[in-house]
Amino acid sequence: MAKLTPMMEQYIQIKNEYKDAFLFYRLGDFYELFYEDATRAAQELEITLTKRAGGKGDPIPMCGVPYHSAENYIKTLIDRGYKVAICEQVEDPKTAKGVVKREVVQMITPGTVMESTMLTDGENNYIGSLSHFQDGSYVIVYNDLSTGENRLAFINDGWDAVIHEFYNQPIKEIVISSNLPEELQIQLKERLNVTLSYQDEVTFNAEFRELSENLNDERLMKAFSRLLNYIQTTQKRSLHHLQKAEVIELKKYMSLDMYSKRNLELTETIMKKSKHGSLLWVLDKTVTAMGARTLKKWLERPLLSKQKINERLEVVQGFYDGFMERESLRDLLKSVYDLERLSGRIAFGNVNARDLIQLKQSLSRIPAIQETLRQFDQPEITRLAEMLIYPEQMVESLEKSIVDEPPISIKEGSLIKEGYHDQLDTYRDASRNGKKWIAQLEHQEREETGIRSLKVGYNRVFGYYIEITKPNLHLLPEGRYERRQTLTNAERFVNEELKEKEKLILEAEEKSVELEYDLFIQIRDQIKEEIPLIQQLAHIISQMDVLQSFATVSESNNYVRPDFNDEQLQVTKGRHPVVEQVMKDGTFVPNDVVFDKSQNMLLITGPNMSGKSTYMRQVALTSIMGQIGCFIPAEQATLCVFDQIFTRIGAADDLVSGQSTFMVEMLEARHAISNATDRSLILLDEIGRGTSTYDGMALAQAIVEYIHHNIAAKTLFSTHYHELTALEDSLHHLKNIHVRAEEHEGNVVFLHQIKEGAADQSYGIHVAKLADLPNELIERASVILEELEDDSNKKPTPTKDKLESGQLSFFIEESNKKKAEMPKQEKTHNNQEQSVIEDLKNVNVLDLTPLEAMNELYRLQKGLKQY
């Protein structure tokens, strides 16, 4: 039986070590993929699948991509959640005995991307790890390999808290123990849409001792080691740029669960998953990539410390007041490149000369930035100037060494300036002098042969040559040159003198290129030692950029600086920060909001499309803006510090997610009332809409009462159940407000104004008219509405005693009364009809998704039609 070729044996041996990755196997100028890798890659990358002989059995499936354009193909695979192992030739094929030695030099995974073309400038690219301990606690670790950031957090509130924490970060890959229960692994993959990787080795590596100085708990050390061991195993190179681990004390930040982040559209919109239309879109006036990433991190973790909030607000105030100085600062910051990721590439070894020029240009701006900061009349801003350290020696070294416009490649020369290195100058002189001699040779040979068209040229295959056109060959003295190449219209020759000069020139050029590469590596390694300083500068500049961004957006959008206290929230003429920017005509209607000790729950009524949800989101968004240190859209504002914000606002339910709309409502409501405190903000929009009227009304009232009596969180509760407005008489901290609307000539006009008291009608039919439903349908609905209202007027209203009892007994009594008045149906159904009825009785509506409910209804209806 035929054996595999030695090369394919080598491939299989390497592939067996990287079974969960596409193996990009270097063959000459291509990366080749074989077997199942080739079949899948051909589909994913839309490239041709071929076959090659492997020395055993049937031909082997194969596909390949050119190495010089492989990055785009790798990016496609990484974006789809795959891993790629890069297998390179690690010895010179000219000196190799047998098969050229190859080994994997790097594993690229969704969470360990370093190539700039695969990264988004304004976003972190986190890899995380999750470790579970016997005491029930979890430790989450985040690392952004491109910036060197390391952060850890304890999670002591159970599995849901783990999911919420991961959801709030741009996580691409999570490293876990292979012993984590399978059902939890499935939840991580499905709920977070991440790649899972495994690392069971958590032994602490002494190499990481300096990085873990801030960790004083064995659980933190093990969790950190799990992630670092995985990164070191996959990357196989220097991790010199990794920063000391920072422990995130979650209790110092506002908690925003996954529902709130989604419903409030903090960083992306619900429908389009786009930054445009989110709060981040409005606030982002940063001019550096570092600042954009920092802004997003701040937005996801608002502060709880009033002192720290006010420290940020002080700097924003200073930037706000100094318009001209701020514009000068913005112009300077625009010329600062991404220092965090530049330092990462320097440490990683994939930096090029253009990157070093970007570093030089960025650092050279620091003196001007310092001078501009000193012009502000604000101590906190001038203190920033003193925190910046100008690395003058590094800038001077780069100025002397690297040419201003270097090539991308660092292995083809033309990187180092003249005068930087004596030996390099000698090689260059030899090369230049040789080329000058060749130019003189051409003139000399033309004179001596009399052939005016004779020329001296060069190509990579044949080197230097003397070219004579065929019509002039008869003028060439016999034996003067040695024939080298025959062309259609000419002959090419050499002589001994030319061959000697060629050798000298090429040796000089080769040595020059080699020396330039060595010098570049030396310069890079010198800068590598200064990475902590570069990262410190990046940290200061990124925060400065965010704070000037807050000042810029506050000035352009007419925001006001908020005050903070412990109890009261009072915003005068507040505006929704996003909606007012989308409505560029300036027609947004501002509204007030007041919460204090006597009034911590607002029950909002009013028609659909009137602005209830917008008002609720507005309160939450302005609170978040204040707690990250930004001014807010209002005329005047006093805010309290919220420890958590919970939301249940619709428009994001998934019909086929496996959970009904009502179940989603209940889960989100449960999450809020189970975790909220008296320092929290709760937004509940139309609770109970997903079930029957009586069930929904009963649950809505019970939730209102529970929050009022047991939690005392500041709450905005919108409802279509107008009966609930009577609760104002019995719940002393609840106040009715409504969104004003008026009828004019048979049409409804939404004024979007919040007024005290309950709404007097819902205007639902008017909304249907705006939706352009058929006139016949609208007219019929109006008739039915009049009949229902007449019937309703004959019924008693719920008494205060019944409302205070915590039960909607009135509605239950009415329901029982209707049942009693219904005539008993004669049992005339045949067995088949009765079977359908029994099926209908047994349907558990609350366990069905809307799509499943429609399918079940169709089946039952079809069964009845047969009879």
Swiss-Prot record:
Amino-acid positions noted as binding ATP in the UniProt annotation, renumbered to this chain: 606-613
GO molecular function per UniProt: ATP binding; ATP-dependent DNA damage sensor activity; damaged DNA binding; mismatched DNA binding
Keywords carried by this UniProt record: ATP-binding, DNA damage, DNA repair, DNA-binding, Nucleotide-binding
Name this protein carries in UniProt: DNA mismatch repair protein MutS
Function: This protein is involved in the repair of mismatches in DNA. It is possible that it carries out the mismatch recognition step. This protein has a weak ATPase activity.
Lineage: Bacteria, Bacillati, Bacillota, Bacilli, Bacillales
CDD domains associated with the record: ABC_MutS1
Similarity comment: family membership: Belongs to the DNA mismatch repair MutS family.
Pfam families: MutS_I, MutS_II, MutS_III, MutS_IV, MutS_V
GO CC, alphabetical: cytosol
NCBIfam families membership: mutS1, PRK05399.1
GO biological process per UniProt: mismatch repair
